[in-house]
A protein has these predicted regions:
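Conserved P-loop NTPase motor cores
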Residues: 3-141, 172
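Conserved P-loop NTPase motor module
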Residues: 130, 136-177
Length: 177
C-alpha cells in the first residue's frame, strides 16, 4: 500500500493517521490471535516524511513491540529536531528502538552533536619535540596517546555529500559511499 498526500495541505493528515492506526491494530490482532504471536510474512512500513504525517498516539510503544510480531519500520526524517518537536520528552525512544541508523548529512546542530556522540572517541598518537639553544642547549621528545572524538559535531556537519555514516546495533560505525 502506497499513500501520497499533498505536503502543502495538512487537512488530509488525519486520514493517514487513521489508516496507520487501523493497519497497526489489525496486524497486531492477526499476529496475537491468529498467528501465534508472529505474522507469517514480515511486514515493513517505509515511513518517508515521518515527521510530517499524523501518527498513532502510541507510536513509541508500537515501535518498541512490533519486532516481536514480524513488523518493522523504516523511519525517514531530516533531523532530530523534527522528532523532538513531535515527541517532546520521549523523542529518544524512536532512535533507541531502531537497530540501524543511517546519517546522510544535514544542517541541524543537535543532530550533528548526536551523531558525534554516537561515533564515540578514538585514540591518536601525539609526538612533540622541543629544543633550547644556548650554552647548554637541550632537546626533548614526548610521545603521548590522546583521546579524540572520531568526528566532532563540526566535522559531522561537513560530511561529504557522497558519504554516509551507518550505525548498526552491535557493530562499530561504518562510513560508506
Amino acid at each position: 500500500l502506497f499513500c501520497v498526500i499533498p505536503d502543502s495541505d495538512k487537512s488530509y493528515n488525519f486520514i493517514i493517521g487513521m489508516l496507520y492506526t487501523q493497519i497497526f491494530q489489525e496486524l497486531y490482532y492477526q499476529a496475537d490471535f491468529n498467528c501465534g504471536g508472529r505474522l507469517p510474512i514480515h511486514v515493513t512500513f517505509m515511513l518517508d516524511e515521518f515527521a510530517n504525517v499524523a501518527l498513532p498516539d502510541d507510536f513509541c510503544s508500537l515501535l518498541s513491540t512490533m519486532r516481536s510480531r514480524e513488523i518493522s519500520s523504516i523511519i525517514i526524517i531530516q533531523n532530530f529536531a523534527q522528532l523532538k518537536a513531535l515527541f517532546k520528552d520521549t523523542w529518544e525512544t524512536i532512535p533507541g528502538n531502531c537497530d540501524t541508523f543511517i546519517y546522510l548529512g544535514g544542517n541541524e546542530q543537535s543532530t550533528h552533536k548526536y551523531v558525534s556522540e554516537l561515533l564515540g572517541k578514538g585514540t591518536i598518537d601525539k609526538k612533540s619535540s622541543g629544543e633550547t639553544k644556548g650554552r647548554q642547549g637541550s632537546s626533548s621528545r614526548n610521545y603521548d596517546v590522546l583521546g579524540r572524538e572520531l568526528f566532532t559535531p563540526d566535522e559531522v556537519r561537513k560530511l561529504d555529500n557522497k558519504k554516509c555514516i551507518i550505525f548498526i546495533r552491535g557493530f562499530d560505525p561504518i562510513m560508506d559511499n
